[in-house]
Amino acid sequence: MTEVLGRVHSVETMGTVDGPGIRFIVFMQGCLLRCQFCHNPDTWKIGTGTERSAQDVFDEAIKYKEFWDASGGGVTVSGGEPLLQVDFLIEFFTLCKAAGVHTTIDSCGGCFTRDPEFIEKLDRLMEVTDLILLDIKQINPEKHLKLTTKSNAPIIDFAHYLRDKEQPIWIRHVLIPTKTDDPEDLTKLHEFIQTLPNVKQVDVLPYHTMGVYKWKEMGIRYPLEGIEAPEEEVVALANKILETSSYK
């Protein structure tokens, strides 16, 4: 059988914000979206990154198992968009589950499709996936298109797929002043989340500018220049509307 290679951008050995506990995070290369607030624009380009086998990445990750066991952690595959490399994920997570490791995917679902071949692979992947971190950038279709250059229809459909699979998910929403903090949009997002009984946690992530330097290094104009982190009261209102405390 031909070994599946994944295109990996980088890894983080002791992540604490991408799933429960301490986690080994694999950032995959390639993404279809072009989010104006992306803090990893260097992961966008498809076909670049370092080619690595699932076994190779697993062998590096498993060295940190004692930290996962002590904290309830595991491995998270992020990006970029990890679902663009579903074959690699299946192989990598199969190795992880055989070793008793908790597995998480951080995805917006922007590449989701009902294509039978993709669904067949995704079904197999869900069998070895414990948790999905689903990033919903903007529930309003027009605003989502302007913010990311892509429709949010595949993302909404991916959420429906995960609901039907009864796959545990955490919803994550980046709160950006003037872009994603409109109370009306947040209310609609809350109403959508209420249709998903498989949601186990909802997180409001305040916008930050820590990735702006990457845009400058790549020679790309940063489109949100001048926008600062949201005020505490704005974050509090978002948490109230989304009822995040009810999931704790």
Curated annotation (Swiss-Prot):
Positions of [4Fe-4S] cluster binding: 31, 35, 38
CDD domains: Radical_SAM
Keyword Metal-binding among UniProt keywords: yes
Listed GO MF terms: 4 iron, 4 sulfur cluster binding; [formate-C-acetyltransferase]-activating enzyme activity; metal ion binding
One cellular-component annotation, GO: cytoplasm
Domain Radical SAM core: 17-248
Enzyme class of the recorded protein, top EC level: oxidoreductase
A Pfam family recorded for this sequence: Radical_SAM
Cofactor(s) required, per the database record: [4Fe-4S] cluster
Compartments in which it is found: Cytoplasm
UniProt catalytic activity: glycyl-[formate C-acetyltransferase] + reduced [flavodoxin] + S-adenosyl-L-methionine = glycin-2-yl radical-[formate C-acetyltransferase] + semiquinone [flavodoxin] + 5'-deoxyadenosine + L-methionine + H(+)
Keywords of the record: 4Fe-4S, Cytoplasm, Iron, Iron-sulfur, Metal-binding, Oxidoreductase, S-adenosyl-L-methionine
InterPro entries: Aldolase_TIM, Organic_radical-activating, Organic_radical_activase, PFL1_activating, Pyruvate_for-lyase_activase, Radical_activat_CS, rSAM
Co-factor remark: Binds 1 [4Fe-4S] cluster. The cluster is coordinated with 3 cysteines and an exchangeable S-adenosyl-L-methionine.
Broad class of where this protein is predominantly found: cytoplasm
General function of this protein: Activation of pyruvate formate-lyase under anaerobic conditions by generation of an organic free radical, using S-adenosylmethionine and reduced flavodoxin as cosubstrates to produce 5'-deoxy-adenosine.
NCBIfam families in alphabetical order: PFLA
Name this protein carries in UniProt: Pyruvate formate-lyase-activating enzyme
Organism expressing this protein natively: Listeria monocytogenes serovar 1/2a (strain ATCC BAA-679 / EGD-e)
Primary gene name: pflA
